[in-house]
Amino acid sequence: MGSLVSSVVFDFGGVIITPITNQISDLAGDLGCSVEVLREVLMGPSHESGSHPWHRLERGEIDQHDLQDALAPYAAALAVPWRGDEVARVLAPGQFTVHDEMIECIRSLRDRGYRTGLLSNSIREFRPTLEHYAPPSLFDVYVDSSEVGRRKPEPEIFSVLLDCLDETDPSRVVFLDDFVANVNGARSVGLRAIHVGDPNSALRELEILLARSPDAT
């Protein structure tokens, strides 16, 4: 039997709430480009963390109001019309739905004795919204990329997470994320990780994994 699971950690976008790709899809239709191209313009490559403006935003290196102009060269390079309101439209409030089953799972895990965590690639200006829909009181640890200056899939952010959990054995931590690159990043440093496509399927996978070892209590 593997190590006893002590902690379960959740991403925010695409796990606790519906993914930002939904907003990108709506905007792509208006701009007359594919979702894939617009996502590349807005968010850069998902398999790495580099100098793309969105990556810098999520590391807290630039402010949200700088993003629109910073992305203009990326849009021009891919012949995407850039009208000046794209970032505001994608990040406008009220465009997502909370997965209530994830919130209930987090509460249940704490009742069963597991430690819970949030690990999110987020934006400094988004913090009030993040805390509203994922209250810190639900979690033992709360890791926001824009606060710690690291973002998934950088190995260093998983080290920050483990330090916050005071956990020396990464295999005792399960992480749920909707981006394959982030799942692979977590696994590369020894965490157990579940890719979230359908939330209910991911929760079933989590319960199967937890059933292989006794409850943390």
Label each region the model flagged.
Residues 1-10, 110, 123-217:
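Asp-based, Mg2+/Mn2+-dependent phosphohydrolase catalytic module
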Residues 2-103, 111:
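N-terminal helical cap/lid subdomain that shapes the substrate entry/recognition surface
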Residues 33, 114, 191:
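Short glycine/serine/threonine/alanine-rich loop segments
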Residues 96-98, 122-125:
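Short beta->alpha connector loops
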